């Protein structure tokens, strides 16, 4: 059986990257929450 996680850098960036987060209101909310929490890495 094939595993479900088949890593792809492009797909990862397009779905979870910083620019994608910035492109929506809720995405910006996610970044703000991660900044507030003090995360070292904000997005994939």
From Swiss-Prot:
Q: Does the keyword Ribosomal protein apply?
A: yes
One GO cellular component this record assigns the protein to is:
ribosome
Listed PROSITE patterns: RIBOSOMAL_L34 (PS00784)
One term of GO molecular function: structural constituent of ribosome
Q: Which UniProt keywords apply?
A: Ribonucleoprotein, Ribosomal protein
Which InterPro entries does the annotation name?
A: Ribosomal_bL34, Ribosomal_bL34_CS
User: What's a BP term from Gene Ontology annotated to this protein?
Assistant: translation
As given in the record, the signal peptide range reads none
Family listed: Belongs to the bacterial ribosomal protein bL34 family.
Q: What is this protein called?
A: Large ribosomal subunit protein bL34
**Gene name, please?**
rpmH
């Amino acid at each position: 059986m094939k595993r479900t996680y088949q890593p792809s850098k492009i797909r990862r960036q397009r779905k979870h990257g910083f620019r994608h987060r910035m492109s929506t209101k809720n995405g910006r909310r996610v970044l703000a929450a991660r900044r507030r929490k003090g995360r070292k890495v904000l997005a994939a």
